[in-house]
């Protein structure tokens, strides 16, 4: 029986991932955790939740022992934009939290660890179009640096200790449920909210900025598909490229204008433009498709329909 701990279960991805995992493995078998951010009512009401700091090894170990955990999914991270404001915090949370996770999993002989990576691992020297699975990794942010180190650490634990460690390089993730927390691609979520609330949006990157993106249902699907894949089919482990769609801000705005004709957008690029410019336009995810059958379901138009519909429901209820 799987006993899964989701670290960072109050975050943008973790808050939705945990609910899907509970529907698959049973509410009591999927434990959520967070440091201080209050999780959603749905997370609290459907299963166990513990507050602790993953940087504190003893606290993480105690929760793993208490619930007899055999799989850890560590979603806790300081993201790219926030990490540039406080790089030492990003290093501490992202690296020490990961090391604690890997060491405890090794000591307790756990079944699996899943730790996501990011397109932030890419940087100058990476091909901008269809960034390959194997390519130059020279990130320009502390977040990206920790993710490169995390990929290498995960692969090291596979080779050195036989621990099953898996990871995938998330593109920008878009969702109408939990707001993102300080990433460079946050504009792709904020634009939908502002379109519904104010019919206008000021974007912090330029209109021709093009980045790989993914809708949350595909993000959850990719994570669980990789988690459930047969280990023997995996040639890669901690660093899978996963793609779904790629679009510029102008194309995103046009997609919204088709549905809200009065919507307008303006541009005031800030420090996040440099980060976005260091990332590729798209990724080559052939390895994920071959090794564990990755296949996304949503494109830009389908996502825009769903985002606007669900955010309008929130707005009409006075929730935003």
Residue ranges and their predicted role:
Residues 4-24:
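N-terminal Rossmann NAD(P)H-binding glycine-rich loop of SDR-like oxidoreductase domains
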Residues 54-93:
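NAD(P)H-binding glycine-rich loop region in Rossmannoid oxidoreductase-like domains
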Residues 74, 99-142:
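Conserved Rossmann-fold NAD(P)-dependent oxidoreductase catalytic core, especially the SDR/UDP-sugar
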Residues 117-118, 151-177:
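Conserved beta-loop-beta element that borders a ligand/cofactor-binding pocket
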Residues 123, 138-142, 166-186:
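Flexible, glycine-rich beta-alpha linker
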Residues 171-180, 190-214:
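A conserved pocket-lining segment of Rossmann-fold NAD(P)-dependent short-chain dehydrogenase/reductase
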Residues 204-206, 211-320:
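C-terminal substrate-binding subdomain of Rossmann-fold SDR/epimerase-dehydratase oxidoreductases
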């Amino acid at each position: 029986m799987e006993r899964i701990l989701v670290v960072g279960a109050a975050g943008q991805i973790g808050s939705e991932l945990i609910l899907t995992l509970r529907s698959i493995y049973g509410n009591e078998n999927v434990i959520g955790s967070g440091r201080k951010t209050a999780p959603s009512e749905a997370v609290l009401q459907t299963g166990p939740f513990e507050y602790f700091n993953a940087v504190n090894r003893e606290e993480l170990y105690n929760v793993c022992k208490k619930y007899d955990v055999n799989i850890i999914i560590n979603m806790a991270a300081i993201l790219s934009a926030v990490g540039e404001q406080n790089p030492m915090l990003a290093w501490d949370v992202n690296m020490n939290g990961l090391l604690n996770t890997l060491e405890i999993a090794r000591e307790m002989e756990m079944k699996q660890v899943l730790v996501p990576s990011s397109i932030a691992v890419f940087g100058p020297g990476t091909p901008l179009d269809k960034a390959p699975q194997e390519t130059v990794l020279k990130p320009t942010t502390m977040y990206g640096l920790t993710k490169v180190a995390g990929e290498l650490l995960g692969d090291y634990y596979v080779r050195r200790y036989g621990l099953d460690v898996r990871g995938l390089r998330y593109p920008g993730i878009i969702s109408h449920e939990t707001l993102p927390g300080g990433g460079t691609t946050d504009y792709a979520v904020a634009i939908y909210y502002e379109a519904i609330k104010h019919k206008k949006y000021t974007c912090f990157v330029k209109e021709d900025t093009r980045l790989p993106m993914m809708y949350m249902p595909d993000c959850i699907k990719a994570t669980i598909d990789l988690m459930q894949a047969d280990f023997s089919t995996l040639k890669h482990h901690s660093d899978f490229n996963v793609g779904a769609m790629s679009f510029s801000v102008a194309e995103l705005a046009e997609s919204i204008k088709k549905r809200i004709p009065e919507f307008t957008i303006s541009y005031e690029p800030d420090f996040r433009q440099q980060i976005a410019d260091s990332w590729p336009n798209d990724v080559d995810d052939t390895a994920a498709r071959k090794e564990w059958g990755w296949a996304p379901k949503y494109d830009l138009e389908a996502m825009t329909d769903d985002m606007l519909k669900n955010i309008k429901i929130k707005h009409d209820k006075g929730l935003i």
